[in-house]
Swiss-Prot record:
Pathway it works in: Secondary metabolite biosynthesis
Gene inactivation effect: Impairs the production of cordycepin.
GO molecular function: dGTPase activity
Name of this protein: Metal-dependent phosphohydrolase cns2
Gene3D superfamilies: Hypothetical protein af1432 (1.10.3210.10)
UniProt gene name: cns2
Organism from which the protein derives: Cordyceps militaris (strain CM01)
């Protein structure tokens, strides 16, 4: 039995023997994993790499926001679909849904993505997977290569503003870490979680069985968006960091392949070493000045405005319905928030 190792802010992993791993998550509790494909994936270098990557890029790396990691989020999404009874392939898809994320996460979108392009890690996912052992690992265990297409698994990915494991885990993990949602309320959300009509039907949905719990979650999600995800000051730091990275990659001073090979800390050291004096001053300003005053900063047109409208399936009802239908006041509140953020562009 090994000692527990940190996967991030709210999660540890412990290898009990060669055949099982105990995950302890402050939101979800304990989860014992013994399926061979999951144990092998959890121990793989490709999955473990995500421990060194902050969900929130430069703000996480510099300690401005909590250092929530891509690893704890990926494992969290896996736990959520597992808890509602998802098939093994959907559990694998959840675990691997962020596997191609680069160092500094979405900062790289501001550095290297072309206008109108999707997130850099999604556009280059196939390219990255070819350099890994992951396709061979899942094939060895009889799992389809479709697990690398998480959009095929409705419990893992659904269009916004619906609930899915990816969206729900980062909502809970970030809202708790940033103090926007009490741990007790986060755990009530998990207790309220269900799959409709079941976890294995073709048109399956993640739903909550309590409208008040869904409302608490949705409001915390909106608050986290306003203060963190679409905070113009945080986005400004992403853009400034992205400019330096883009210049260094374009000049050939940093190879883009290293984006999948090093941790945030290692990459930051590489940037400092490769930077010219002007770029080094820009890096030092990011390190010393922190989050800029957001007075006068506008929300960029490319910035997502994130809201949640989870499906609610009260016990005894035949069909779920969006929270905005169950509680029309939430529909009005949500639209008012979207309008208020749009006016800041």
């Amino acid at each position: 039995m090994s000692c527990p190792t940190s996967a991030g802010v709210l999660q540890t992993h412990q290898l009990l023997n060669d055949n099982s791993i105990l995950i302890r998550d402050e939101i979800y509790g304990e989860e014992l994993v013994s399926e061979p494909v999951l144990v092998e994936l959890l121990q793989s270098a490709e999955v473990q790499r995500l421990q060194g990557i902050c969900q929130h890029g430069v703000t996480g790396f510099l300690g401005i926001t909590p250092r929530v990691t891509r690893l704890e989020h990926s494992v969290g999404a896996f736990i959520l679909v597992r808890r509602v009874g998802a098939a093994l392939d959907e559990q694998v898809a959840a675990l691997l849904h962020d596997i191609s994320h680069t160092t500094l996460s979405h900062v790289i979108d501001h550095a290297l993505s072309k206008p109108g392009e999707g997130s850099y890690h999604e556009v280059h996912k196939a390219r990255y997977l070819k350099t890994t052992r992951l396709p061979d690992i899942v094939a060895k265990h009889g799992i389809s290569q479709k697990v690398f297409e998480e959009e095929l698994f409705p419990l893992v990915e659904m269009p916004s503003p619906q609930l899915c494991a990816d969206r729900l885990d980062y909502a809970l993990r970030d809202a708790v870490s940033f103090g926007k949602l009490a741990m007790e309320d986060a755990q009530k959300v998990v207790s309220s979680l269900r799959a409709f009509p079941s976890a294995t039907t073709a048109r399956r949905l993640l739903v909550l069985d309590d409208a008040e719990v869904a409302l608490t979650l949705s409001r915390a999600y909106t608050t986290t968006d306003k203060d963190v995800w679409s905070n113009p000051a945080h986005i400004d730091m992403y853009e400034r960091t992205g400019r330096v990275i883009g210049e260094l990659v374009e000049a050939g001073s940093v190879e883009d392949k290293v984006l999948w090979q090093v941790s945030d800390a290692e990459f930051w050291t590489m940037l400092r070493q490769a930077a010219n004096p002007e770029q080094r001053r820009a890096i030092e300003r990011l390190e010393t000045e922190g989050v800029p005053e957001d007075d006068g900063l506008e929300l960029p047109h490319c910035a997502k405005i994130r809201t949640l409208d989870p499906d609610v399936w009260p016990r005894g009802e035949k069909q779920p319905a969006p929270l905005s239908i169950v509680l029309p006041t939430w529909g009005t509140e949500r639209q008012q928030y979207i309008l208020s953020r749009t006016q800041h562009r």
